[in-house]
Amino acid sequence: LPICPSGAVNCQVSLRDLFDRAVILSHYIHNLSSEMFNEFDKRYAQGRGFITKAIDSCHTSSLQTPEDKEQAQQIHHEVLVSLILGVLRSWNDPLYHLVTEVRGMQEAPDAILSRAIQIEEENKRLLEGMEKIVGQVHPGVKENEVYSVWSGLPSLQMADEDTRLFAFYDLLHCLRRDSHKIDSYLKLLKCRIIYNSNC
């Protein structure tokens, strides 16, 4: 569902509609990333002990994101909006490479590839929607494009199968974690900004 019909000039969408769409999208992305992680885990990670190796060192860890709802509630909504944008931007590059590398996998399972493609597309749409929200909540504010650089591509291309599969596992684990955070923060923001915290 495009936010504005193509060719529409001065199209205005209410802030509530923008938030509704963003929450639906973020929830969908989180569901897809959970399904993709579970599929990968079932197909490639069984018996390899990846879960014990998956230290919580996602490339987005440098962005100081709140760990839970209680922490998130202490953060001013402007900061929360910036964090969401930062996390979304931080995934542009890894999602692009994830799709490319999954395509190159032997017998790349469609269940994983199709979800990776969808998540990459939906992440861009959610980022676009968030930028529109920022435009309405803080008109005229120049947004700092803060994001974390991902340097995990060489690991996804390793010749050693175990190392390579673990790199995929770790990336999908982080994607699931971050998509859950974004989903939670967005619901919190919608409650705060649209419903004046009465929800």
Swiss-Prot record:
Keyword line:
Disulfide bond, Hormone, Lactation, Phosphoprotein, Secreted
Residues annotated as carrying Phosphoserine in the record are: S26, S34, S90
Where on the tree of life does the source sit, at the highest rank? Eukaryota
Q: Name one GO cellular component term.
A: extracellular space
Q: Which CDD domains match?
A: prolactin_like
Q: Does the keyword Phosphoprotein apply?
A: yes
Any one GO MF annotation of this record:
hormone activity
Location(s) in or outside the cell: Secreted
Give one GO biological process term. Answer: response to nutrient levels
Q: Spell out the InterPro entries in the cross-references.
A: 4_helix_cytokine-like_core (IPR009079), Somatotropin/Prolactin (IPR001400), Somatotropin_CS (IPR018116)
**Disulphide-bridged cysteine pairs:** C4-C11, C58-C174, C191-C199
Briefly state the protein's biological role: Prolactin acts primarily on the mammary gland by promoting lactation.
Subunit and interaction comment: Interacts with PRLR.
**Family note:** Belongs to the somatotropin/prolactin family.
Record's protein name: Prolactin
Native organism: Balaenoptera borealis
